[in-house]
Each structure stands twice: as C-alpha cells, then as structure tokens.
Amino acid sequence: MDLRSELLKSIWYAFTALDVEKSGKVSKSQLKVLSHNLYTVLKIPHEAAALEEHFRDDDDGPVSSQGYMPYLNKYILDKVVEGTFVKENVDELCWTLTAKKNYRPEGKSILPAKDAFRLWCLFIFLSEDRYPLVMIPDEVEYLLKKFCMAMSVELNYVELEDFISQDSVQQNGFTVWTFLEMMNSGKLTRGIAKETVSMAIEEVYREIVGDVLKEGYLWKKGQLRRNWTERWFTLRPSTLLYFTSEDRKDHKGNIQLDGNCCVEVLPDRDGKRCMFCLKTLTKTYELSASDTKQRQEWTTAIQTAIRLYVEGKTSLHKDLKLKRRDQREQREKRREAKEQELQRLRALQEERERKMAELELLKEAQRQAQAMLEQDEQRRRQQHEQLHQALEIQLKEAEEARASMQAEMALKEAEAEKQRTRIRELEAMQQRLEDALQQEIKARQDEEAFRYAQARLLAEEEEKMKALMGLREEQEEYIQRAQREKQELRQEMESKSRALEEAQRQLEETRANRYRVDQDVVAAQRKLRQASTNVKHWNVQMNRLMHPIGPGEKRSSGGSFSSFRIPSQKDPALRQKQKSEEQDEESKENMESRGGCEADRRLSTNGQMEIP
C-alpha cells in the first residue's frame, strides 16, 4: 500500500464525517476548510486561486466525492512529497473530524482518546483496499494477538468468537466503530490495568504504523573514548536511531543501514557479555545486549532491516500484510479446491454407492436367476424322467400295437380291395353329383340375372314415381295459381293432366313388366329348388355309399349295391318333405301377390298415388 492510498483512507473518513445527511455530498464551504487544513498538515504551498477556481460556481449546493476527487488528486495528493510532513498529523486531523461525529463511547470508556486514535490508525493500516473500509476477522485476530504478546497475556478467544459471530461482522467484516466498541467493552482486556493496555497499544502502534522493528536498551562502545554507554535504540527499516533514554527526547545519533551493512556476533570481552557488532562501509559499531535472547532478537531484527532495504521495501508490516493476504487467498483457493475435490469425491462416492447398489441388485438378480435355473433344471429333469417313463409305456404299447397291427394287416389287405372297388363306384357317383351341381350353379346364375333385371325395373319405377310426385307437386302449384290466373293456366293444366296420364300408363307398363319378371324369378327359384332337391338326393345316396364295411359284416350275394336302396316316390318321408316345400312356395307366392295388390290399391281413381 503506497503513501497515496494511506492518505486517501484517512481523508475518506474526514469526508464521510462532513457528510451529515449521508447522501455522498458535502457542502463546498466545509470542503474548502478541509482542503486548507490538508495544505497545512501536508506542508504544501497554499493555492487560494486554484481552490477558489475549482469551487467557483453560482450554485452553493454540496459536492460529491466524485466532484472532489479530481481536485484532491491534482492539487493536493500529486504535490505530496514523502518525508516533508508528519503523517501522524494528517491522521490526527482526519481523526478529529470523524471522531466528533462517529466516536461516542457509551458509559465508562476504557480507552483514552490517544489510544482510540492509535487503534483507528492501526485499523486503517490493516483494513482492506476497498470502500467502505473494513477489516476482516483474521486481521483483527492478528492485531489482538500482537496486543496480547505486548502485554504477555493469552488472547480470550471465547469473547473474540462472540464478536466475530455477529451477523454484520460475518457478512461485511469489522468497521472501525465496531472494532473500537469491542475494545471499549473491556471483555478482551478483563483483569488488565489500563496503563498496561495503553502501553501495549502504543508499542504495537509504533511497531506497525511507525515501522519500528525493535526498541530497547543496548550498551554502545564509543568511537573516540572507547567507553561503554547505555543507550535507547530504535530500529527502523533503513535507520538505527539511539537516544539517551526511552522518552526519545535527546537524540544522540543514527546509523544508516544499506546493503553493505552486516551484523556479527562477538565473543565476550572487556567485562561485557552478549556482544555483537554492526559493520557499515565507514564504521563498526560494537553493541552489548542484556542477555543472549536479546542479542538474538537484535541481530535478527537488524538483518531483517537490511533485507528490506535490499529488496526495496520500506515497511516490514506492509510486506507481512501482503504476505498474509496472499496466504489468505492461497488458503481460499485451497479451500475452494478442497471443496471441489470433496464435491468430486462425494460425487464419486455417490457414483460408487450407486454402482455398488446396482452391483448388489445384479448379484441379487443373478442369485434369483441361478435359483430359477436350478428350479428349471430340476423341473426339466422331472419332465425328462416323466417323458422317459411315458416313452417306455408308449414303446410297450407300440410293440403291442405292432403285434396287433400285423395281425390286422392281412384283414386290411382284403378290405382294401373291397374299398378300391367301392371308391370307383363313389367316383362315378361324384361325377353325377358334379353334373347336378353345375345345373344348380347355372340355375343360380339365371336367378341372379332375373334379380338384376327386377332391380333395374324397380329403379326405373322409383324414378318414374319420383317424376310422378314432382308432376303432382307442380299440379298442386298450378291449382293454387289457377285461383288467381284461372283462364291463363287452364291449358297448362290440361297438358299436365295428359302428361300425368301418360306417366300413369308408363307406370302400369312398368308394373306389368315387373310382374313378368317376378314370374320368371319364381320359375327360376322353382328350378333351383328342384336342383337342390336332386343334390340332396344324391348326397344321401353318396353318404350311404361312404359308410365303411366292418370286418365282421356279411354281404349278400346280390351285388355291390345290395345294401343301397334308391328312395321311391312312394316313400312317405320323401312325400312329406316335398309337400312341405310346395307349401312354402305357395305361401311365398301368396305374399308376393298380396304385396302387388296392396301397391295397386294405393292408387286412387284419378291416377294419383296415396302416400302412407
């Protein structure tokens, strides 16, 4: 974090403190006062003309941060020279403005105003580089650990977790006012004196904000008189300062550190223990610590300062802050990677469990299939045994049947000759039946032809009937018109009457033709019945001839057809059957004639047809 970013963080608090309505805008008069004070503390020459020119406007309304930032960057921050001003004065100016509005400790305040200011500076130093400024819980824990180390006490993690578990902290992090409220509550410093807390805050403030790597008393050997004098040393990244006492009022000198400097441990001599020396290009400084631990800490701190100079870094804690941020990012990446890996492992575990379940199902199905196969195999064996037993029984029966068949074969041979003779007789009979069937087919074809002619005549009769109905409707219309135009339509009525008579005459002719066709159909049906009677007669004879002759039957010597008797006309059964068929024909003819009479009866005396 560079100097401009540090200054902007402090100035941001001052700007937001002037924003009374929290609208993001500040009045121009207040911005002028703020700018004038910044000129003073930053040791920048005042440019009243530029200030008035930038804020010159007919409108006296407020100015937003976007409107103030160009002026702040161009006329103030761009002219800042590091080392020409005391940054603590800038922080005090901004703290004074923001504390008046926002810092109101409730009840008995534990922190003095100076400690609250130092905590505010520490918060700005360790806050994230985004606005509004917040400090993440990890940095808060790091800062509290530094305080506890300075006070040589253990951090109260229970109280810290209570503060961190708050919803606002979990979502957004610690604001500076939440942080100061936590420190003012006294829960983290319970049982510790206020003076001890203040000293710890000052020590941590000087270490982090003031870039003090190490402070303490050391014995220093003089360059001229070579005597040993106890001095208060303050180590910064580029300088080792020493004073008469720890109040740092009497500055006795400083040692510039660069890449050519080095520190070495010296053996004890001249009655001094824990000695070490700091070598520069021009001088060698011999120093003595109080104990070995202090010597180790000082040598390590000086080597760290030299390393920072070589690496071009001006602050140890800025470097540590960046490293912690990188570590957090790495931890976050590792956590995300671990979560992804866990998700992948869970997916693989679920897939494995699913496959195991499928495998179990397959095994269960395989076991069931194996059981079914065993059952099928057992059933097949039983069926095979039953089939084998049945085949043995059938084989025995076949042997017995073959023996009986061989005995019967001789009889069958004799019977076969008789059957062949009988077959020849049946073939002759079949030929006669086929002739009779052909006659029946011809009679049916004639009947179909007569029926077709009858249907055609019926269609013509229906068409003429429709025409007659149409003429009748026209006649009725003409009769109605005759009431209005009797003289004009009389001739037309006569012509229509003649046409009607002609249609009636044609209808009578059609009926006569239909009657003749009906007579032909009746004759054809009579022939068909006669042919059917002949076919039935020959079928009876053929069925009698198809009756097989048993092995034990005796035949008379009267010839092959001695058992076959042709029915005569005097047979009572045959006469009864013919009589019933003739009665059926007469009843059908009576029904047809009755239908014709009913049709004739429907015609009126004037030639019109009655509609049922």
Curated annotation (Swiss-Prot):
One cellular component GO annotation, for this chain's record? cytoplasm
What SUPFAM superfamilies does the record point to?
Answer: EF-hand (SSF47473), PH domain-like (SSF50729)
Q: Which GO terms describe its biological process?
A: cell migration involved in gastrulation; convergent extension; convergent extension involved in gastrulation
Report which superkingdom the organism of origin falls in: Eukaryota
Q: Which parts of this chain are annotated as the region Disordered?
A: 546-612
Which ranges carry the PH domain? Answer: 211-307
**CDD domains, per database record:** PH_SWAP-70
Q: Where are the compositionally biased (Basic and acidic residues) regions? A: 572-581, 588-603
Under the heading PANTHER family, the entry gives: DIFFERENTIALLY EXPRESSED IN FDCP 6 HOMOLOG, SWAP-70 RECOMBINASE
Q: What is this protein called?
A: Differentially expressed in FDCP 6 homolog
The organism encoding this protein is: Danio rerio (Zebrafish)
